[in-house]
Each structure stands twice: as structure tokens, then as C-alpha cells.
């Protein structure tokens, strides 16, 4: 694994500047090249967003079935030379998928709401689903909420905090009813780092989000879904109440809360339909 710069230094830079480091996939130059082609679409989307009230509704009841958790990475079309083009879902596909979910009676909730139902006598809608986004790319904070707000839905952003979205974008997501959780400081393979670095990746990323957003940060997202017993134990010790993987399946009250499954969406509507029918 490529050695990381000093995490202590990285965290100081994070606190002072609010950005730094590099994304886990694709180059900065490649992403910059695609920015102009997508800016007009996402600017229009931003203008249409309405504030969402994501709190439980009177019609919600205790729910004991399986809850699907989806995970999206980047939205839009992959630019030429992108290292991981399969992680992109086009804007049209994303809109079609959200429309289909709504037509099927699904209602998006946050991980906090799901966990409250599972373990604290909370409530959920009749057909709940959790829609998560990993890493913290700009379209996840602009285009995705514009589409999801049509249905009054919140999302969940798992943020890499050293190379994070600017604070105003994160705060705006929270104002829309979104949940923002930790995806580590720098997205390393946590099974390959020292115990000290593991603790920094977990604790400092959580503290940063809590300090900036003034909200609970209860969930952790394992970078690249890499974990072992030591990593899971460290996640618990850092104060998280649950963690998400990229293993497919439905979350239930009987699922290990630190190994919550998610369906990774990398294609069109047919893939989503097949996942939810499994």
C-alpha cells in the first residue's frame, strides 16, 4: 500500500483548510476535465431542491422485515481514462431508479432511523429503503438531493474527511434531512494500517464531522469494504453504533449492526430490480 503522509499533519490541514488529499479512484485531472460537461445539469438540479423533513411521520409503524440499503458511488458519465468507470451511474439511470422505487412504494429513510426502529422501538414507513453514497463527490451533494427531494427523501453520505466536500455543502445536506457519516480520513485499507493509524482514521474523521455539523455521527463505512475482527473492534471502540459493508443483502434487527449489508448499484434499472427481488 502506498504510504500515507502523517495523519496528524493531514488532520491539521483538514481543520484549517477544509480540503486536501486525493480521491480513492480516478485522478484530479480526469475529474476536472469532466466538470464543465456536467456543471450546467447540476446547477439546474441545485436550484430545484426543496428542504426535506426526514423525521418520522404519524403513519410510520414498527418494522421487523428486511430493509435494503443501496450504495452509489459517482453519478454522471465516466470521463475518458477513468480508472473505475463501472462505479458511475448515469444521471438518467439514477433518475429512473429513484422514480421506479417511488412507484413501487418505497420510502427512503436514514440509517439512524433504521437503527432506531431495529433497536430502540422507533418506527419506519411501510416499505423503507436506505440510499447511501460513498466518498463525497460533488454530484452526490447536488444532483442526488435534487432528484430525491422530488419524493421528500433523505440520503446518507459517507464522507472521506481529508478530501471532503466543503463545509457549506455538508451543512446543506444536513439541512435537507440527510445523514452524513464517516468513511475514514483518507480511505486506506484499514486491515493493513497500524493500530495507532486505525484509531486516527476512525476517531478524527468522526470528530471532524461532529464539530462541523453539530450532529451525531453514528455510522462508519469501511473503505473498499475491507475489515477484520480488529477493525470491527476499533470501530466499536471509536463510538460508532453501526457500520456498513458492500456485501449484498437486507438488513434486519438480527443483522450484526457492524456488518450491515448493502446492494452496490453500478448499472441501470434492471440491476436494481434484480437486487431487490433477490
Language model segments and positions:
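N-terminal pro-sequences and low-complexity stem/linker regions of secreted or lumenal proteins
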Residues: 88, 92-94, 145, 156-162
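Acidic (Asp/Glu)-rich catalytic clusters
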Residues: 145-151, 164-182, 236
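C-terminal active-site subregion of NodB/CE4 polysaccharide deacetylases
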Residues: 31-132, 137-140, 168-171, 175, ...
